[in-house]
Regions:
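Generic secretory/membrane-interface signal
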Residues: 10, 14-15, 69, 73-77, ...
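Periplasmic c-type cytochrome electron-transfer domains
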Residues: 134-748
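Intrinsically disordered, low-complexity peptide-like regions
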Residues: 1, 19, 81, 96, ...
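Intrinsic low-complexity, intrinsically disordered segments enriched in polar/basic residues
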Residues: 8-12, 81, 112-115, 120, ...
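Glycan-association/targeting regions that enable binding to alpha-glucans and other polysaccharides
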Residues: 21-158, 200-204, 209
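Generic marker of residues within folded, mature protein domains
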Residues: 11, 28-30, 38-40, 63, ...
Length: 748
């Protein structure tokens, strides 16, 4: 019989505030045997931040127990230390409060109660964090200790480690490459077809079972549970096959205490691959039978891990961490032969709160804001967004430019650029009088303000150090209706990993900046300081070819405004030049709730894993990449903040190969349009993760800000300015070394 006390963990999100609380809350810690109970005497939300024995910092949303927030740390021995602080909502000021860092030393006895707004002793503060070390200058960090956090996806209790992961339904099984139907999205994917899986691992705490709970948004009809991959008879065969027990219409449970793969009791370290067979209760609109994502859970560890495969049956094994490009958001090794769908996936560690919002955000991403239609067949129009397009616009939907969420390709010559952003303005940074800040080539009625097209390519030639020839090209542009004097044509970039880039602490980027080239290495990257359009404070620019926006939300809202003509609370006024007609006024066409869904979708796209981890050529190429000086700007590894609101993005070690800084890349890549503090020659270091999948996702290759580079070699050869030395080092390599370096890039 299912024991709900240990088999179910309930996440409670408290939306109401205390009434009449005029004082800050009392907080502290009470020892209890080998445990310590941390508490905040409030029943609004509260978070604990703690460092155990000077190890890494952990951040958790506390739970309400007997009217107050509590969190218990278990397995303590006398003398162990915990440095801790709390962030909690104080209704007396309608604000969040941070408590001072305090050190607790476990003794197993109960200390005197602490006074309000104080800890048990002054103690020693924990190591500095991103929130405690602000960047130089006026930049205000996005996230600090006072940022409200969504619930963690892994929770540790006295009896279990509990993992929760949000998911969507799938057409076929993960390894069925003959069908190529695992990574794509089926009709009505946004309707009644998400759930989350809860893994309650009692083995991790000395117990003898793992309970898997399935939480749904729509009633399921006797879903199946499979665990421990077998793969002998079919590519979807498992040793453990059971039917979930129905607890209620939205909760189903099953337990495992025997590792049928090994013929023994389940134990710590077991590789437990799991899959759910989904059957929607009928009658239901559309198809009723599906499969879940395939996950690998390592018993005793907590959290699902990206997996690779081994042997002829392609059994799942934990992916080496060198392959975790996006930390735990990293996608498992693809086995369904769908190269075009690699950038469409949910983060591997998606939180339950994100699952339904993700698919609804994807629906908005694929919606035509003119007629409300969905870009994929079988999906009804989203009628609430009909008629919001324009009047001037570039494309009718997000996906029109970001096809498969990948890099766009230049269109044929003399074709209007509708998958580019053509920024315009004056040499002093002011708006173009008749165009504003964007050239919008389409209009819902009347004559468009103007259009740009590539009329041809100017080709130049050169030779590598070994005498091998190469050709480079640059686009030639022409305009209709209005010809701007200052402009910058920028092709649509890939979208994966943006949430992780937002989560990098400003202090980490500040540590990489060297605006005056103080170390004399010829690299002088600088942070782009941009204005927050919502608060007016100065932020670190992170997104766009010149790092001109600070957050994913701002980037999405700007694209909606300037590319689709859809206003939001972030940008309520349309792009409009001072002498331009028909674009004045303010409005909010897309509500914040819808903008939030779209932002969450973009933020939580899974990052593909690095591949070919044991390939000798690619590994040699990595060394050549570093030795050539490429990594001086394309920083391999960074760690995200502990304070990002989304649990999926917090505390992740990622490998984006960017420093998010502006670098002068020389006259060859320069345009004549200033962008905030960025000059025409300065460009943000673009991330390299996923770059080796470009051809499969986009159906071709195009790199750099205007798509001029037809392959990775050309992209490198265009580097000038601060990138000139690295470019020359590449050009002077022999053919074998150049190919090795390219093999490394293609493995990313």
């Amino acid at each position: 019989m299912h024991n709900r006390a240990t088999g179910m963990a309930v996440v409670v999100l408290v939306a109401t505030l205390l009434v009449g609380d005029a004082f800050a809350a009392t907080f502290g810690v009470t020892p209890s045997g080998s445990s310590a109970v941390f508490y905040v005497d409030t029943n609004a939300w509260a978070d604990i931040h703690y460092v155990r024995n000077n190890q890494g910092q952990l951040n958790y949303r506390m739970g309400i127990v007997n009217g107050r927030n509590q969190y218990t740390v278990t397995g303590l021995s006398a003398g162990e230390t915990i440095d801790y602080s709390f962030t909690y909502w104080d209704v007396s000021c309608n604000c969040a409060r941070d408590t001072a860092w305090t050190r607790y030393t476990h003794s197993g006895t109960q200390p005197p109660p602490p006074p309000p707004d104080a800890g048990t002793d002054a103690g020693t503060p924990p190591p500095p964090t991103d929130a405690g070390t602000p960047p130089p200058g006026p930049i205000v960090p996005l996230y600090t200790t006072s940022t409200p956090l969504e619930p963690a996806t892994v929770q540790e209790t006295a009896t279990a480690i509990i993992t929760r992961v949000g998911d969507r339904v799938r057409d076929r099984h993960a390894r069925e490459d003959m069908f190529q139907s695992y990574d794509h999205y089926l009709p009505l994917y946004f309707q009644a077809r998400t759930h989350y899986i809860e893994i309650v691992d009692e083995v991790a705490k000395g117990g003898n079972r793992v309970t898997v709970n399935l939480h749904t948004v729509y009633p399921y009809d006797r879903p199946d549970f499979r665990a421990f991959f077998r793969g002998l008879g079919t590519v979807a065969e498992y040793f453990h096959n059971a039917q979930f027990t129905t607890v209620n219409d939205y909760l189903y449970t099953s337990s495992v205490n025997f590792n049928a793969k090994e013929g023994r009791a389940i134990r710590v370290g077991d590789r437990m691959e799991l899959e759910v067979g989904v059957f929607l209760r009928q009658p239901v609109e559309g198809r009723f039978n599906y499969y879940s994502t395939t996950y690998l859970y390592m018993v005793g560890s907590g959290g699902v891990v990206p997996y690779d495969v081994t042997g002829s049956i392609r059994d799942s094994i934990p992916m080496p961490q060198a392959g975790w490009s996006g930390g735990r958001t990293t996608l498992s090794s693809p086995q369904s032969n769908e190269p075009d769908n690699r950038f469409l996936q949910m983060a591997n560690n998606l939180a339950p709160v994100s699952a339904q919002a993700f698919v609804e955000g994807r629906r908005i991403h694929h919606t035509n804001f003119g007629d409300g239609s969905h870009s994929e067949p079988g999906n009804p129009a989203l009628t609430q967004h009909q008629g919001k397009l324009g009047p001037s616009y570039v494309a009718p939907s997000c996906v029109s430019c970001h096809v498969q969420n990948g890099r766009a390709l230049p269109p044929g010559t003399n074709t209007t650029l509708t998958n580019y952003v053509v920024k315009v303005g004056q040499s002093n940074g002011a708006a173009d009088p008749f165009l504003g800040y964007r050239l919008q080539p389409r209009r819902t009625s009347g004559t468009p303000e103007g259009a740009a097209r590539i009329t041809g390519w100017t080709v130049s030639s050169g030779t590598y150090g070994d005498g091998t020839g190469f050709e480079l090209r640059r686009p030639d542009y022409a305009f209709t209706n209005n010809t701007p004097t200052n402009y910058s044509a920028r092709i649509s970039p890939q979208l994966v990993g943006m949430g992780l880039l937002e989560a990098i602490p400003e202090s980490a980027i500040a540590a990489l900046a060297d605006p005056n080239d103080g170390n004399g290495d010829g690299i002088s990257g600088r942070m782009h300081q941009v204005r927050d359009p919502q608060t007016g404070v100065t932020r670190l620019g992170r997104f766009g070819w010149k790092a001109s926006t600070a957050t994913v939300r701002h980037q999405v809202a700007e694209a909606l405004n300037s590319d689709l003509g859809v206003t939001t609370s972030v940008f309520p006024s349309l792009d409009c030049g001072p002498s331009q007609q028909g674009c004045a006024g303010t409005s909010t066409e897309l509500a914040n709730t819808e903008l939030d869904k779209l932002t969450r979708y973009i933020s939580l796209l899974g990052v593909p894993a690095r591949r070919n981890l044991s390939d000798a050529t690619a590994l040699r190429g990595e060394t050549l990449f570093n030795n050539a000086g490429c990594a001086r700007c394309h920083t391999a590894s960074l760690t995200t903040s502990a304070y990002h609101p989304h649990a999926e993005l917090r505390g992740q070690t990622i490998r984006p190969y960017t420093d998010l800084l502006l670098h002068d890349m020389g006259a060859g890549l320069a345009d004549n349009l200033p962008d905030g503090q960025a000059t025409g020659a300065e460009w943000r270091t673009p991330p390299l993760w996923g770059i080796g999948l470009t051809a499969g996702v986009s159906g071709g290759e195009a790199y750099l800000h205007d798509g001029r580079a037809r392959n990775l070699s050309e992209a490198i050869l265009w580097h000038g300015g601060e990138g000139q030395a690295a470019r020359n080092n590449f050009a002077n390599m022999n053919s074998a070394d150049r190919n090795a370096l390219l093999a490394f890039l293609r493995s990313l």
